[in-house]
């Protein structure tokens, strides 16, 4: 779980736009965030298994 101080800092508008970075909306994780969904890979996987992300299927080839 991300530190609460870092999550609060992330929510504020940065002084310069280049300082902005992605962070998971659910858990606050700063790494491996899928921009299309706005959540990290771990949260994405959990939601996909539950069927809460429409149109998402497990790959099989």
Swiss-Prot record:
Q: Which Pfam families match?
A: Ribosomal_S14
* Family, per entry: Belongs to the universal ribosomal protein uS14 family. Zinc-binding uS14 subfamily.
Q: What cofactor does this chain's UniProt record say it requires? A: Zn(2+)
Q: What does this protein do?
A: Binds 16S rRNA, required for the assembly of 30S particles and may also be responsible for determining the conformation of the 16S rRNA at the A site.
Supply the alphabetized keyword list: Metal-binding, Ribonucleoprotein, Ribosomal protein, RNA-binding, rRNA-binding, Zinc
Per the record, GO CC terms? cytoplasm; small ribosomal subunit
- What do we know about how this protein assembles, alone or with others? Part of the 30S ribosomal subunit. Contacts proteins S3 and S10.
The entry's free-text remark on the cofactor is: Binds 1 zinc ion per subunit.
Q: Which BP terms in the Gene Ontology apply to this protein?
A: translation
Question: What InterPro entries does the annotation carry?
Answer: Ribosomal_uS14, Ribosomal_uS14_bact, Ribosomal_uS14_CS, Ribosomal_uS14_sf
| GO MF term (any one) | zinc ion binding
Which positions does UniProt annotate for Zn(2+) binding? 24, 27, 40, 43
What is this protein identified as?
Small ribosomal subunit protein uS14
């Amino acid at each position: 779980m991300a530190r609460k101080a870092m999550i609060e800092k992330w929510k504020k508008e940065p002084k310069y736009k280049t300082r902005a970075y992605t962070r998971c909306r659910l858990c606050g994780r700063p790494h491996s965030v899928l921009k299309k969904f706005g959540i990290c890979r771990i949260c994405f996987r959990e939601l996909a298994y539950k069927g809460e992300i429409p149109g998402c299927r497990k790959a099989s080839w």
